[in-house]
Design a protein with these regions (language model features):
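Conserved ABC transporter NBD signature motif
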Residues: 136-147, 201-204, 210-218, 228-230
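A short, proline-enriched helix->beta-strand linker immediately N-terminal to the Walker B motif
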Residues: 310-314, 330
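A short, surface-exposed alpha-helical micro-motif characterized by mixed small hydrophobic
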Residues: 358-360
Length: 453
């Protein structure tokens, strides 16, 4: 893909250089627009590392190569999903998902658990691009399929504010020095130094703004030009089997709708595929001509599963697929999903609030609380060595089948204000043992290590 030359900040990127970057970047341009700024003559070999850091071209390429060459199918990095309400002084911000990162490996079932309102469903919807994410990136097969630019825009805003403040401080400093100067030569030197400092401040701010604008253009390009084939390989099973199906459409129309959107208009072939999907999920051909209200909750969920599977997905996001079903039906749906996973080689993200279900269905589990991942580990490790107080609280809520044990079961109440002191030492997601991550600060990390011993 060809590129136009770009003027930006400290660099004069000629067409030859940009073509090299384009070749290395595998066809993901950072844009054709440019800012009119003062050019400084720098040699390509001397400034190549600066260009990497400035535009994030090769780090992104490196990450893509790492993902393609590994078994990581989906990679979520620093995902933030905020919702805004009101306007002006009454504008409020809801942090549904706050800076989470995780990988999903090929063939595994990755569980996301937590109480209602913790952000697990929003995470799934953000991955599948039902929401425009606020900040962060989602990589699928090494390609960035979704990204947010709010942080970049805030950085531009704060850079402009810092520039004004710094120039104001320089001006006040100049006035003070001029008042103390005794000769015209000293005043001339003070004014020259002031102009030089102001120029440096503006140049530095201009470079930062140029960098962030380039990243914003890259994000817009990635969001707009994501290959449709990649997006189609990610499908979702929604939580409510009633509201997720159009009551005015027949089952056949519901299931084949995705095929028609993608340009498959051969009714005979589509009907054949619909029948195959119905049989896969335990329904029969006669059900294709019926409407959703004629089915039970479990059958409606099977229709939702068939609708997702007909697109031949590689990654299936299951958003609490059994929470709205009767207990007698839940086991059937879980067994069906497990069989489909084995038969079709699916990778799954299983969202639930019931740890007892996730334990037997998922390979790894991420526990979410108030938009953050507080613990992430394999299923066996999480149930054997739960460390975070919130994880312990969730596990203590699992009912016991033995009535005698159930009577004596001790519930653990999680109170963040009592369990943590983050006033000075701020927390982050840290690896305490291989594959086991905890959201904690330094002091808590040491305590958790002692607890494991």
């Amino acid at each position: 893909m060809s590129r136009n030359s770009r003027k930006s900040g400290d660099f004069n990127l000629d067409e030859e250089l940009m073509s090299k970057i384009a070749a290395n970047e595998a066809g993901q341009p950072i844009g054709d627009e440019h800012e009119d700024q003062k050019e400084l003559e720098m040699e390509f070999n001397e400034q190549f590392s600066l260009i990497e850091n400035k535009y994030g071209i090769h780090p992104q390429l490196k990450r893509r190569e790492e993902l393609i060459n590994s078994d990581v199918l989906l990679s979520v990095r620093n995902l933030k999903q905020f919702f805004f309400f009101g306007s002006g002084l009454n504008k409020t911000k809801l942090k549904a998902v706050s800076n989470i990162s995780f990988d999903v490996h090929k063939g595994e079932c990755f569980g996301i658990v937590g109480e209602s309102g913790c952000g697990k469903t929003t995470t799934g919807r953000s991955i599948i691009k039902l929401y425009d994410i606020t900040s962060g990136s989602v990589y699928y097969k090494g390609y960035r399929i979704s990204a947010g630019d709010r942080w970049n825009r805030k950085e531009i805003k704060f850079t402009k504010i810092r520039e004004v403040r710094q120039i104001k401080e320089l001006r006040e400093k100049r006035e003070l020095l001029l008042a103390q100067a005794t000769t015209d030569a000293q005043k001339t030197e003070i004014n020259a130094q002031y102009e030089y400092d102001v120029l440096n401040v503006k140049k530095h701010s201009s470079n930062i703004i140029s960098t962030q604008k380039a990243k914003i253009r890259q994000i817009k390009f990635d969001n707009k030009h994501t290959p449709r084939k990649l997006v189609n390989e990610i499908q979702m099973i929604f939580q409510d089997p009633v509201d997720s199906l159009d009551p005015r459409m027949t089952v056949e129309d519901i299931i084949q709708e995705g095929l028609q959107i993608q340009g498959y208009h051969n009714r005979a072939e589509n009907h054949k595929k619909v029948v195959e999907m119905l049989e896969k999920v335990g329904l029969v051909e006669e059900h294709a001509s019926r409407y959703p209200h004629e089915f039970s909750g479990g059958q409606r969920q099977r229709i939702g599963i068939a609708r997702a599977l007909i697109m031949n997905p590689q990654l299936l996001i299951c958003d609490e697929p059994i929470s709205a079903l009767d207990v007698s039906i839940r086991a059937q749906i879980i067994n069906l999903l497990n069989d489909l996973k084995e038969d079709l080689g699916l990778t799954m993200i299983f969202i639930a609030h019931d740890l007892s279900v996730v334990k037997y269905f998922c390979d790894r589990i991420a526990v979410m609380y108030f938009g953050k991942i507080v613990e992430l580990a394999t299923s066996d490790e999480l149930f054997k060595n739960p460390l975070h107080p919130y994880t312990k609280s969730l596990l203590s809520a699992i009912p016991k089948p033995d009535p005698l044990i159930e009577k004596t079961r001790q519930r653990i109440i999680y109170d963040p204000s009592r369990a943590h002191d983050y006033s000075v030492d701020k927390p982050s997601l840290r690896e305490i043992t291989p594959g086991h991550f905890i959201y904690c600060n330094d002091q808590e990390l040491e305590n958790y290590k002692k607890e494991l011993k």
